[in-house]
């Protein structure tokens, strides 16, 4: 979970998940709904995810690939039916 202070100095939860705010940066280039993604190295499906924002807020579907068994199981648990996890 990421948090930030808004203009009123209140703490709010961010709707973005990616490390270094990559999802924020690429949104201006991928500014459409119902897209498709492929994410390699999906981790647990939430932390440092480059695709979760697009799935959760822009109705994208896609494929997540995670080679570490423990993270793979977390990813399957954490992501919706809109994503296929391998």
Question: Where in this protein do the model-derived segments appear?
Answer:
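Non-catalytic N-terminal targeting/anchoring module and adjacent flexible stem/linker
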Residues: 1-14
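SAM cofactor-binding core of SAM-dependent methyltransferases
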Residues: 14-86
């Amino acid at each position: 979970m990421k948090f930030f202070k808004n203009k009123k100095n209140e703490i709010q939860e961010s709707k973005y998940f990616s490390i270094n705010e990559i999802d924020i940066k690429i949104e201006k280039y991928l500014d459409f709904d119902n897209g498709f993604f492929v994410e390699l190295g999906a981790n647990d499906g939430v932390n440092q995810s480059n695709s979760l924002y697009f799935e959760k807020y822009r109705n994208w579907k896609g494929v997540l690939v995670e080679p570490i068994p423990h993270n793979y199981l977390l990813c399957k648990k954490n992501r919706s039916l809109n994503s296929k996890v391998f």
